Amino acid sequence: MSGIAKAQIITNFDPGFKNILVNYVTVDTNNDGIAETDYTGYMDTNRDGEIQVSEAQAVKSLVLGYFSGSPHMSYVLQSVAGIENFTNVTYLDCHYNKLTSLDVSGMPQLQTLKCSENKLTSLNVSGLTNLKYLDFSYNDMTSFDATGLTTLTTLKCFNNQLTTLVVENLTKLEALDCHSNSLTALNLTGLSGVFKKLDCGFNSIASLDVTPFDLTSLHCAFNQLSVLELPNQRNLQLFECYNNNLTTLDVSNCIALQRLHCNNNALTSLFIKNGIAEISLGFSSNPNLAFVCVDDAEMNAVQALATSYGLTACAINSYCSFVPGGGYNTIYGLVNFDKNNDGCDANDIPLKNIRMNLNDGTNTGTTFNAVNGGAFFYTNAGDFTVTPVLENPSYFNVSATANTFNFAAASGLSQTTSFCIAPNGTHHDVEVVMVPMTVARPGFEAVYRLVYKNKGTQVASGTLNFSYDEAVLDYVSASLTSNALTSGAASWNFINLLPFETRVIDVTLRVNTPTASPAVNDGDILVLNAAIAINGVTDEMQADNQFVYNQKVVNSYDPNEVECLEGEKLPTSKVGEYLHYVIHFENTGTADAINVVLKDVIDEAKFDMGSLQVIESSASVYTRINNNVAEFIFQNINLKPGGGRGHILLKVKSKSNLVSDDTVSQKANIYFDYNFPIETNNETTTFSALGVNENELDQTVKVYPNPVVNEVQISAQNNIRSVQVYDIQGRLLQVQTGGEMNTVLDLSTQNQGVYFLKISTDSGSKVERIIKQ
């Protein structure tokens, strides 16, 4: 061996290095990284002042660090020339010295090398195919090529002056820390799935691809990143990317994330809906942040953070996706109508807009099945029960292949069941509702949608009638050719309306101008009436066979609104009955609205949440109801800019314990994609007794016919003192006095519509609602 004299003495050591080897403890015998302080820590075992080959080859762990544990080591190494003689060393620690170069290529057994906190500008580790751990942080290296280090698992090279770092194809590499250098690029090509930890912060890196890896920690702060994608980081726990140029950041797939700091970027959108509440979250100093997508459970906390950052115009919701963040399971429910009452099969009818409840033993959620007959719930782990809730449950029998489900974990599992709804007896029941598709403006066209549905068990055929005041409204067209068209009226014959089926007809009328005769002006009321009847049979629920709509004429309007179709004032006799609401929305922006969400927080003290039904919508809608929050999701609606419109028609019962002068209100927030929500009007309806003392009702009063054309007959078992006529707004229109038990009221001067008659007799009063045709 070169440099070996008699007795195999090694002679090529740097003098300072030899001094350390001979006079100080440098040997670690128990593999704790610290030189032993007793005689076993001395390499010169025979104490002859020399290092023999046998002594060098006996060493497995060599500790030369300044803080090696020896109380006497005060000498700082400037060279380790001769280090190649330690051919069996697997662990070398020479940190915190003044080495400017280090060549350990002749130490083939080396597995761990710690040479941080020196002044290295050169490091040769070529050929070290057993090296697993390398730390040369806090040096002056400008480049490093790790090619060939095929077993390397950990590389620490932070706080150098690196402009080039080659780590490609290190298939065993698990952790890389190269922060605080001068890198402009970092190529991770060829690293494998074992790569878990990366710290490359405080560089000038402009692009970084970590998509192939499932990291547990990622620190890339203080770089020049404008894009960073994290589609596969399901085990990422710590993530810091502050002080970059990121405009959007999506950690939706990071379902184990505990720490996220993305402060001081150029973010306009942030997606943190991942099913977990981060322990530490920061996104300050992103003044252009307009949208944050979060889990519902995090909504309040993230909103508070945004407020503290001064982000008053930042929309925060969960509507970047319509499945839960993180892990979840899915229950699919198919609903079919057994028209022949012989068991559901492939020939039976898939139903839509059937209310479905999900119960986990404590809480209940609701959805309505879609057009293909399917409904779905997203769940965590646990036991769940799914139940169809029909408007008329006594009409039908319901059976299911299964309605209870168990999931051991929220891990992407799914289960499917089928519900079969069959007739329970013979029931004839249809309904009609009129929906304004536009406002009524003087001189412009107005569109009205007639929505009719078979709620019974039998196929229905019959007639749908539509009437209006032809003095102020002119018929223009209808989406379905009428069977009869007369002045102020149109009718359509319908056949084979299936149970649960809904159909619509749109009718267009033109409103008189302010200069026409008679004139129509802002604030006028237009009265329109729709009625439906089944041929040859009696409808079991005639109250919903007629719908009167009183529309106020306007000159201007808000296209995003909620309207109660029954009006702003109703008699107390309507308490506990259905109210119909239409929510209109319009895309007034400059780009397509891909998704639209209507969020309605319903007052449970005023409304019966269990009665809510979806009747009709302008496009396919996914409904979910949790507690008193109803969300109507129009996914992929692609609503065109500059006037693309949509709507949903609902009905819900008011609580039966409401009294005179109580009000019910509805409003909604409308979310167009990632924009700040638009808040609609607060639509308020007041229940009023129209001055009647309900403790003094005269139940003998009878009013007929109803509906009425011109004259209405009124009778009672007591003398009728007066009859007062009120319109739907509660205004007194007409008074008739008398003293007999029978009287005739002439309504020929009143327009078509709904009126209230307050009839006062010797024994009390009564209010009756009538419809004038």
Regions inferred by a protein language model and the residue ranges of each:
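A short, solvent-exposed beta-strand micro-motif common in secreted/extracellular proteins
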Residues: 281-283, 373, 381-395
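Short beta-strand elements of extracellular/lumenal beta-sandwich folds
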Residues: 434-459, 572-601, 669
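Short, acidic Ser/Thr/Gly-rich low-complexity loop/linker segments typical of extracellular
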Residues: 339-350, 357-378
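C-terminal outer-membrane/trafficking sorting elements
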Residues: 135, 177, 199, 240, ...
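N-terminal capping/linker segments that flank leucine-rich repeat
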Residues: 5-91, 271-276, 287-329
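Extracellular/luminal low-complexity Ser/Thr/Pro-rich, glycosylation-prone repeat/linker regions
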Residues: 404-423, 515-574, 586, 616, ...
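Low-complexity, intrinsically disordered segments enriched in Ser/Thr together with acidic residues
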Residues: 494-522, 633-661
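Residue-level detector of functionally pivotal "anchor" positions at catalytic/ligand-binding pockets or at interdomain
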Residues: 320-332, 347, 422-442, 557-561, ...
